[in-house]
């Protein structure tokens, strides 16, 4: 059981650190949107690259924030029955859901995106706009990174659920839980 706890803590720590860093990018995105509005409407200067950078950050925040959201149980669920379940029953639902749905979907996204991302890298795909950002291939790489990070956190959730189902008191197993505010 000790190796499982070590793996679980490593994944949880990685997800927590990356999630908190990514959360700060929303502030950068707000600043860039204000900059786009000010330069466009007050200075009458438009910047395609600046507008695209907002889109890039938006993609980065949403795609790379999925694992952090999963860790903090922030994904939408229909919990008509779930909320009344015991912790062990909830863990069983999470374990089965993780194994039957989360893992296969992450693998499907990764493998169906693989050729698409490689093709973009092969040509160093750039923006269709003349003054756009020349890094579309990097943006598309998020399509591979997202399922990897989500799968890693899914594995952590499966481990936690498995421990609960097997009767282990996870609060006494030195699992890292960080509930501090991001800001």
Predicted regions and their residues:
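Alpha-helical transmembrane segments and membrane-interface helix-loop junctions
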Residues: 1-183
């Amino acid at each position: 059981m000790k190796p499982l706890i070590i793996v679980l803590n490593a994944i949880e720590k990685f997800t927590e650190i990356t999630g908190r860093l990514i959360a700060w990018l929303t502030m950068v995105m707000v600043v860039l949107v204000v900059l786009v509005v000010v330069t466009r409407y007050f200075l009458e200067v438009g910047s395609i690259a600046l507008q695209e950078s907002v889109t890039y950050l938006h993609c980065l925040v949403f795609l790379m924030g999925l694992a952090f959201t999963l860790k903090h149980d922030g994904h939408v669920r229909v919990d008509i029955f779930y909320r009344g379940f015991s912790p062990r029953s909830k863990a069983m639902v999470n374990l089965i859901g993780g194994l039957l749905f989360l893992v296969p979907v992450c693998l499907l996204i990764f493998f169906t995106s693989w050729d698409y991302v490689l093709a973009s890298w092969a040509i160093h795909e750039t923006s269709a706009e003349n003054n756009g950002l020349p890094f579309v291939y990097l943006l598309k790489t998020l399509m591979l990174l997202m399922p990897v990070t989500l799968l890693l956190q899914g594995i952590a959730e499966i481990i936690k659920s498995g421990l609960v189902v097997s009767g282990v008191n996870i609060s006494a197993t030195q699992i890292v839980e960080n509930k501090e505010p991001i800001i």
